[in-house]
From Swiss-Prot:
Alphabetical list of InterPro entries matching this protein: Ribosome_maturation_RimP, RimP_C, RimP_C_sf, RimP_N, RimP_N_sf
Function: Required for maturation of 30S ribosomal subunits.
CDD domains attached to this UniProt entry: YlxS_C (cd01734)
Key words, A-Z: Cytoplasm, Ribosome biogenesis
Subcellular location: Cytoplasm
Any single Pfam family the record assigns to this protein: RimP_N
GO (cellular component) term, any one: cytosol
Principal localisation: cytoplasm
A Gene Ontology biological process term: ribosomal small subunit assembly
Record-given protein name: Ribosome maturation factor RimP
Taxonomy, superkingdom: Bacteria
Family that this chain belongs to: Belongs to the RimP family.
Length: 151
């Protein structure tokens, strides 16, 4: 069965792309009565607040019609930012060599939290160099993955 995030991504991809943006990813955080639906968008020339507002109106209209979430939630539309979350194998592959922070569902090498450089993406498997040790993580074991911004 598809997750809520994947169903929402399928539902919102076309409307976001119709406005000239890429749907980078979806994050749904349940926090009791105050759940949050985060929609991350990206564009060739970056994203500004007006872009977010336009996408928010379009996404809100689609969600009002489709009504995929039965509880109250707050809709947030933003760019992925410098510490961008990663959602797909293609996104991880685009950042080979970059440092990432991973939160895992099941421990790998005794830890559910890893920081290291992406060395390879092979299908649905991600290789990460953590303190000189090569670890392999299944993408479906990653609860949350973010680029570690370098300043």
């Amino acid at each position: 069965m598809a997750t809520l995030e994947s169903r929402l991504a399928d539902m919102l991809k076309v409307p976001v792309e119709a406005l000239g943006f890429q749907l980078w990813g979806i994050e749904y955080v349940q926090a009791g009565k105050h759940s949050i639906l985060r929609v991350f968008i990206d564009g060739e020339n970056g994203i500004n607040i007006e872009d977010c507002a336009n996408v928010s109106r379009q996404v809100s209209a689609v969600l009002d019609v489709e009504d995929p979430i039965s509880t109250e939630y707050t809709l947030e539309v933003s760019s992925p930012g410098v510490d961008r979350p990663l959602f797909t194998a293609e996104q991880y592959a685009a950042y080979v060599g970059e440092d990432v922070k991973l939160q895992l569902t099941m421990p790998v090498a005794g830890s559910r939290n890893l920081k290291g450089a992406i060395t390879q993406v092979d299908g649905q498997m991600l290789s990460v160099n953590v303190n000189g040790k090569e670890l392999v993580v299944a993408l479906d074991n990653i609860r949350k993955g973010n680029i570690i911004a370098k300043f």
